[in-house]
């Protein structure tokens, strides 16, 4: 399926994840909890870090998807083309990609709690090695409407944090590179 995904990602400062999770469960439609494992790849013909693309296999509660994400198309939100294909076998897809020259970049694990509010999906993410985040996502939604919704949602729920346009992949790679280059 092809669509434009628009999202805003916020590194949570307050309230703590457990408090926010309880608050949102009492206030909004809870869609469930997911354990996700993502494997990211880089292309043999171009560097996805340079082209701002991503290719991953995601395993989430027994479902496996291959996802291509195109370059970001906005400086206000993380908006990009996204194509998802359900696959039946993670190991075989991994072998296909590696035999085609794709290289594994990193594996990322997170626990995600999803909520539905109007036309938006609200996700609380606890990302191994990175901490806690809030994502507000709309599919094929107007960017201005998304940004207004985000501001109102944060204010209404007294959420403090820092917005980032970087993906979890970018944040984790940066953290690893910083750790590896830090002489201390």
Name each model feature, range by range.
Residues 69, 129-133:
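Residues forming anionic-ligand binding surfaces in small-molecule and nucleic-acid pockets
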Residues 92, 110, 131, 145-149:
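Residues forming well-ordered secondary-structure scaffolds
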Residues 60, 124, 144-145:
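C-terminal accessory/tail domains of diverse enzymes
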Residues 123-129:
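Short glycine/proline-enriched loop/turn "hinge" motifs that connect secondary-structure elements
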Residues 144-161:
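Long, well-ordered alpha-helical scaffolding segments within enzyme catalytic domains
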Residues 1-119, 156-184:
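N-terminal strand-loop-strand beta-hairpin
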């Amino acid at each position: 399926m092809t669509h434009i995904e628009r999202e805003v990602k916020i590194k949570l400062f307050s309230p703590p994840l457990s408090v926010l999770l309880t608050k949102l469960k009492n206030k909004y439609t809870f869609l469930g909890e997911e354990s996700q494992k993502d494997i990211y790849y880089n292309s043999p013909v171009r560097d996805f870090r340079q082209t701002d693309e991503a290719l991953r296999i995601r395993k989430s509660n027994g479902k496996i998807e291959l996802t291509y994400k195109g370059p970001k198309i906005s400086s206000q939100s993380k908006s990009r083309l996204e194509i998802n294909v359900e696959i039946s076998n993670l190991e075989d897809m991994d072998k296909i990609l590696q035999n085609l020259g794709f290289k594994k970049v990193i594996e990322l694990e997170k626990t995600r709690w999803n909520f539905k509010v109007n036309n938006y999906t609200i996700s609380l993410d606890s990302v191994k090695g990175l901490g806690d985040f809030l994502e507000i996502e709309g599919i094929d939604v107007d960017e201005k409407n998304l940004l207004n919704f985000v501001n109102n949602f944060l204010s209404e729920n007294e959420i403090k944090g820092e917005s980032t346009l970087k993906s979890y992949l970018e944040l984790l790679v940066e953290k690893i590179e910083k750790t590896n280059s830090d002489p201390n």
